[in-house]
Amino acid sequence: MPELPEVEHVVRALRRAIVGRRIVASQINLPKLILPLSQPVFNRKLKDSTIAGVRRRGKYILIELEYGDALPPGPATAPERGPAVHRSLVLVVHLRMTGKFLYLTADDAAPKHGHAIFYLDNDRRLVFCDQRQFGVMKLVARTRLSKAKGISDLAPEPFGEDFSLAYLKETLSRSRRTLKTLLLDQTRVLGLGNIYAAEALFRAGVNPLKVAATLSSKRVERLHQAILDVLREAISDSSTSRVNLENSNGFSYGEAFERFWQVYEREGEACVKCGARIKRVSHGGRSTYWCPKCQRR
């Protein structure tokens, strides 16, 4: 599953490609993708909207849709009759395991697993592909976005003021879960998945199986800094992420930091710091990697 850095790279690529474009029409080939909305309602709400922006909240992609001074197309209810008002919606997308966007020309062949197609006013298509069909799309009024399911309970953004050292200390002190399990909880620490949690714990020199509440203040400080450092480096332009929206064969995420991995998927290899062999254990249904010497405590 793409983690925060990979989603950020996708957001940047989408922003360059589609901001300012108008959605002429849309087509849904996988009805469950947009539940509980029906296909006709979903398509009607998107028709003639302009893509005003693309941003991220945690691992969610937020595509902001504007309708200028007109209401979204459709039958007007009684309160909506009269002067036109400004309306805006947000298309909330979670890629889950295999979701990806492609930005195609009219001549490009239809890609496999293309479950949502957005026809734009420049004769291009924005196609959402998802081989495993776990991805999710939903339309939310911008004024209600902060209260939307999946968004409302997210932890603070890691680069915002709210994700402070004090916040992390308080969060860890209240939990009897292991550090690795807690770091994967998006309602406690945002944006980390299996890869970056393992890398942050290694940089901090902390055992992933340690109970969160037992971590010393000094180690919490090291972990806080390690989380920020790992995410910043993976998001930076020098990372190895490749997001080519125009070529499905060149589309690659989940590798934004691969050449810098120090423990993840390195079981049995020598630790880059001490030479000990990296270990792996199944924990919480996922593989956890760590150095038994550098991360003893």
Where are the predicted features?
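Gly/Gly-Pro- and Ser/Thr-rich, intrinsically disordered tail segments characteristic of DNA damage-repair
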Residues: 1-74, 83-137
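Catalytic cores of large soluble enzymes that bind and process phosphate-bearing ligands
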Residues: 2, 6, 160, 219
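Basic, nucleic-acid-binding surfaces and adjacent catalytic neighborhoods in DNA/RNA-processing proteins
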Residues: 22-42, 55, 167-297
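Phosphate/anion-contacting hairpin/loop surfaces
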Residues: 87-191, 196-203, 211
